[in-house]
Design a protein with these regions (language model features):
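ATP-dependent adenylation/nucleotidyltransferase module used to activate substrates
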Residues: 1-174
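Local cysteine-cluster metal-coordination motifs and their immediate loop/turn environment
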Residues: 103, 179-202
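Residue-level recognition of conserved structural "scaffold" positions that shape functional pockets
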Residues: 17-18, 199, 215
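Short cysteine/histidine-rich metal-coordination sites, predominantly Zn2+-binding motifs
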Residues: 186-187, 207-218
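Glycine-rich nucleotide phosphate-binding loop and flanking beta-alpha elements
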Residues: 125, 204-205
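Short amphipathic alpha-helical interaction/hinge segments
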Residues: 148, 205-208
Length: 218
């Protein structure tokens, strides 16, 4: 039954969840909030939705780029390099991004009498991003259920698994990961050095899956 909305960025995690839950998804939503890599990731969201026959919309959130502070909004030069868990990667946090997106997706779900919103945060996100942690998802779910007539739930099926496990699941689903984007710099190819590139490389290696990504730094 197609009773769900999914937030899909065009990244590895959300594209995997898109395929994983395709039979239940009535609508996929992407957000253009001025992210450095938006021109790279958003077309992949559209591509995979078209491939699966899932309706897809992109909602502009230009106010975030104007008023929020994050290196993810300040151009490629602002993105720090190094492992995802390092202290300097906190600069890539877009404050309460997931809360804002989940609120909008919940309103759309309620408007269409859909019962849940999927988001693809995973276990590796918890270190840096407060709005990816299990306690946040639990609290947000309580708010959306209390604040909607149809009691829309927020579900994050990958919260307790690693990115490597997501890659393994996606490989089993036959996903073409060459058509996903992770790099926060948003250049022509993945830089290979920023936190998301490092994490992506490590995930494929740990999963024992061939990495189809082209990196500028090998």
């Amino acid at each position: 039954m197609k009773d769900s909305v999914i937030i899909v960025s065009g990244g590895l995690d959300s594209i995997t969840l898109l395929y994983d839950k395709a039979e239940t998804i009535a609508l996929a939503i992407s957000f253009d909030y001025g992210q450095n890599h938006g021109s790279k990731e958003l077309p992949y969201a559209q591509y995979h939705c078209e491939k699966l026959g899932i309706p897809h919309i992109t909602i502009p959130l230009s106010f975030m780029h104007e008023y929020f502070k994050s290196s993810l909004l300040d151009g490629a030069e602002a993105i720090p390099e190094g492992h995802y868990e390092e202290e300097n990667m906190k600069s890539t946090v877009v404050p309460f991004r997931n809360g804002i997106m989940l609120a909008i997706a919940t309103g759309i779900a309620e408007s269409h009498e859909l019962k849940r919103v999927y988001i693809a945060n995973h276990g590796g996100d918890h270190t840096i991003y407060p709005d990816c942690r299990p306690e946040f998802i639990h609290a947000m779910n309580g708010a959306t259920e209390a604040g909607t007539f149809v009691k829309v739930s927020v579900e994050a099926p990958y919260t307790k698994i690693t990115k490597a496990e997501i890659v393994a699941r996606g490989a089993a689903l036959g996903i073409d990961y060459a058509k996903t984007w992770s790099c926060y710099k948003g250049s022509d190819v993945h830089c290979g050095k920023c936190g998301t590139c490092v994490e992506r490389r490590e995930a494929f290696e740990a999963a024992g899956v061939k990495d189809p990504t082209v990196y500028s730094e090998d």
